[in-house]
Amino acid sequence: WRQIAELSGMGFEIGNHTKSHCDCRKISGQDFLAELTYIEEKCREHAIAPPRTFAYPGGPVAENVIGILKERGYVTARSCGDTTFDPQRDDPFRVMGVPVQDNTGNKFFEAVQRATDSAYTVLVFHGVPDLPHPWVNTEPARFEACMEYLAEQNCRVIPMREIFTAGQ
């Protein structure tokens, strides 16, 4: 949590992803609330802003928890997919993020090229690095190359929370 607090202090958005990385489609509302609350309390203990964004563990959208997320003040929830997100058209609790990791080839570049002024590409870097979970690992050199490409393309990179809290 010390490292997470450092990232928060650097301006990184800290979202909720549950305590146990459970399949949210298969648990009760009470159990889901306990999963959310654990992370919220940890954030509070470490002086991290309360999470307002959520990432569905494992990727699939869990329709059964969207109401709870809204009640708790979350503004968006992200799954995994290969599409852009248009906040004027798309549901903020069914955002599809493009995973970027060592095993996804050119998907990063293809996804960035699809972005427009009104349809955003949501990029998901699960771990840089994430050696205990090699299936979602992104080596630091690849991450740096991706960041350089975004800069070269004059891409504007913003946290998810800013898409949904502008003007509030």
Positions of PLM-derived features:
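Metal-dependent polysaccharide deacetylase catalytic core of the NodB/CE4 family, i.e.
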Residues: 1-75, 80-96, 118-130, 162, ...
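Catalytic grooves of carbohydrate-active enzymes
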Residues: 26-27, 98-162
